[in-house]
Amino acid sequence: MSLQFILGNSGSGKSHYLYQQIVNESMEHPEKNYLVLVPEQFTMQTQRDLCAAHPRGGIMNIDALSFMRLAYRVFEEVGREEQPVLDDEGKNLVIRRIAGKLEDDLKVLKGNLKKQGYISEVKSVISEFVQYGVDFDKLDDFMEGLSQESYLYYKLQDIRKVYEGFEEYLRDRYITKEEMLDVLARAVCDSELLKGSVIALDGFTGFTPVQIRLISELLKVSEKVIVTVEIDRREDPFIYRHPYQLFALSKQMVTSLVKTAQDAGAEVEESVCLYEKVPYRFRENPEMAFLESELFRYSRRQYKKKKEESETCSGAISLHETKNPREEARYVAESIRKLVREKDYRYRDIAVIAADLNLYADALEKACELFEIPVFMDHKKSILLNSFVEYLRSLLAMAEQNFTYESVFRHLRTGLCGFTDEEIDRLENYCLALDIKGYKKWQQAWVRRTPSTGEKELEELNHLRVIFVEKTMGLIQVLKQKKKTVRDVTQAVYEYLVQEKLQQKIAQLEKKFQDRGELALAKEYAQVYRIVMELFDKFVSLLGEEEIALKDYCELLDAGLEEAKVRSLDKQL
């Protein structure tokens, strides 16, 4: 049982050194398990790097995992049966339902619950409470230090009520992703996979309390735990003074791991130091090496180009100012095209990093399209504006609002109702002219005429009205029942979607976008039906037998859809 750190600057080769060490040891000890734990988003790349580093081009006794994947591996091995894991969409649904029941008791949150995205923010706060071990006692202790007249006091009081209701609902039913690692920590001692293994942690800037508790258990059963730490040679990694010093996160991580190792009875080995005057990554780039060394330091050192560098330096750092994001994106696209044409770069060698990708995404996509640059946007897109989602939301709104003019034509304009644009225009003009609104008026035959409506036109409009009313009649009857459960509404909506062949219509839209070369939209429509069906499954499994008003169901649906995102995969993967 031991703990060892690999220390070095950014670009000094910590990961390379670690992977080579792991590969070499794994070949010498094929009977031993080697686990490389990295953040979730780096697991695939780490697997590729390890395979590339291995002389045989493959890894047999080495696994690259995230903490969550490790949990599933261990649970599968030890046969531990735990409650189902509640994901973020499920949390949103449960919190929205609990907050709705507590609405009259909430002072601050009450007026914000219906705002788009607010439930997701409350969910994030509760998730962080669980992740960082903030229980009700700690929350109460903190609130005691606040004035009872302060806004923060009442806001925390509301969050505590929702948090308490959330915990009560989950008890003996579900566990959250944040609690998975606590469950894993209890299972570590039963795992043969972990006993005597070598565990490496790479790419982390710090660990949450629940991760520290897990690492403590891993130290007790493994042969060795190795951790890479990004830190400068001028800093002492074993002394953490305050959170505002340089490399504070790294120092905090090292000191907390050292204490954890001591408490677990593990030896702290001498650290491997990969300090170099110029980190390996920047050996051909003195400007970047200087920036890495001096950024955020209070020295007055300035970079001065040496004579022998005048020809080799490429102007690695440059600053440019433009009028708006669109001009910025165009400049970036021009620069990328120049690098590819004149300096033999490949598109996959280039990354564009934006402080707010949502602000720049459209401008970058258009600029890259203009210059014929293939681009992959690494961000998730909300499905709230998808036509199928709008079809679903407007369908329920139409029933809840009793066929108001706005709700009816919001639904018809989604393009998925089976009417042509010309037919919808004619219906809309007639309804506007004669103030047709309310379900009763849509059920009754239309007999009044406008100056431009002839007998044949009126007959055709009534034919369209009958088609629309008859197709929605069964669903509307269920939705208007006074007593109905979440299961009743969900089943009725699902059967209506099947009746209207929405899955086939969405597949046709996906093909249309593919034929047009709009691959991002094609990917979105390929996923959206499945996402909504999975959300319906969560409705039934989490809240199925609860009675619910249609208005509350609409809000519940919005809360679930807020968290639902579609994401495209990088073509390289």
What are these regions (language model features)?
Residues S2-I6, K14, K101-G203, V210, ...:
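Accessory N-terminal region flanking or inserted into the helicase ATPase core
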Residues P55, L70, D104-L106, L339-D349, ...:
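ATPase/helicase motor core of nucleic-acid motors
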